[in-house]
Regions:
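Residues at the starts of beta-strands that form the adenosine-phosphate
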Residues: 2, 25, 110, 137, ...
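Interdomain hinge/lid region at the active-site interface
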Residues: 200-268
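NAD(P)+-binding Rossmann beta1-loop-alpha1 motif at the extreme N-terminus of oxidoreductases
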Residues: 1-51, 55
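Short beta->alpha hinge that forms the Motif I/post-I loop of the SAM-binding pocket
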Residues: 31, 64, 89
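Internal alpha-helical scaffold of NAD(P)-dependent oxidoreductase catalytic cores
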Residues: 130-217
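N-terminal Rossmann-like NAD(P) cofactor-binding module of classical short-chain dehydrogenase/reductase
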Residues: 60-61, 87
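Rossmann-like NAD(P)(H) cofactor-binding subdomain of soluble oxidoreductases
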Residues: 74-126
């Protein structure tokens, strides 16, 4: 198998290491040449992915920010051809799929939206791990839901990464869910850590503090773009969250033990 990786950050780098460990030939593109050179020197990448060899890939994984994903695919679509399956790995799906599905159709390319549900609070190729996706879910957004053979092919192509299960959904449904399951956690954690009290936490914090703050350490550029790409869904979830916080605050302000107890019980 020959796999093309576009972007060698945490996600793309982990895919490169996973497929290399599985015996695949890995070709990669990265905006920073020094990262690509390091990846080749470390053995995770066998060569550079270019417009001349992209059509020879069985699978192409795009691990860039949403806007960069669309730009790369628009620029390369004419060179990809009918053989490779192209899957993007961005954190939101509506903007990417709305732009890339028509481009793919115009050039006879097989393109699917994707979102590997795995990661860490760290970024960059230096933190990439071959087992990052082991046991993780993979969300796939196809252009239509009639091609069962394509679904099976995608599963087989992604099997070396170690995903435990696959979910096939629409871009709209994906973005609605991801606002709650991922983006909310990041924005709430990031806001929580801004309390002046956080500077004095040592000696007074344990597991709950660690759990609450882990994802506050994020890439500001990437997450800002993802939040704005999905702002309608994220703002909806934030409004619900802030309304519930207000209920807790009001109950405490009134010394209302029964109401506070009920609220805490409902949230378990």
């Amino acid at each position: 198998m020959t796999v093309g990786i576009v972007g060698l950050g945490l996600i793309g780098g982990s895919f490169a290491k996973a497929y290399h460990a599985a015996g695949a030939t890995v070709l990669a593109y990265n905006r920073s040449r020094s990262v690509l050179d390091f990846a080749m020197m470390s053995g995770a990448v066998d060569g550079e992915l270019t417009q001349d060899n992209v059509s020879a890939c069985d699978l192409v994984l795009i691990a860039l920010y949403p806007e960069a994903t669309v730009d790369w695919f628009r620029r390369m679509a004419a060179h990809i051809g009918p053989h490779p399956v192209v899957v993007d790995c961005g954190g939101t799906k509506r903007t990417i799929c709305a732009a890339c599905f028509p481009i793919a159709q115009a050039h006879g390319v097989t393109f699917l939206g994707g979102h590997p549900m795995a990661g860490t609070q760290f970024s960059g190729f230096k933190n990439a791990k071959a087992d990052l996706f082991h046991g993780a879910p993979m969300v796939i957004v196809p252009p239509d839901f009639d091609d069962v053979l394509l679904f099976d092919r995608v599963k087989q192509l992604l099997k070396p990464a170690g995903f435990a299960r696959f979910s096939f959904t629409t871009a709209q449904a994906h973005d609605e869910m991801i606002a709650f399951t991922s983006q909310m956690a990041h924005v709430v954690s990031n806001a929580y850590i801004k309390s002046p009290t956080a500077a004095q936490h040592k000696g007074f914090s344990a597991g709950s503090y660690k759990d609450m703050t882990r994802v506050a350490w994020l890439s500001p550029e990437m997450w800002a773009e993802l939040f704005l790409e999905n702002k309608d869904n994220l703002l909806h979830e934030l409004d619900i969250f802030m309304a519930h916080l207000g209920e807790y605050r009001d109950a405490m302000q009134r010394d209302d033990l029964p109401t506070l107890t009920r609220l805490l019980d409902e949230g378990r």
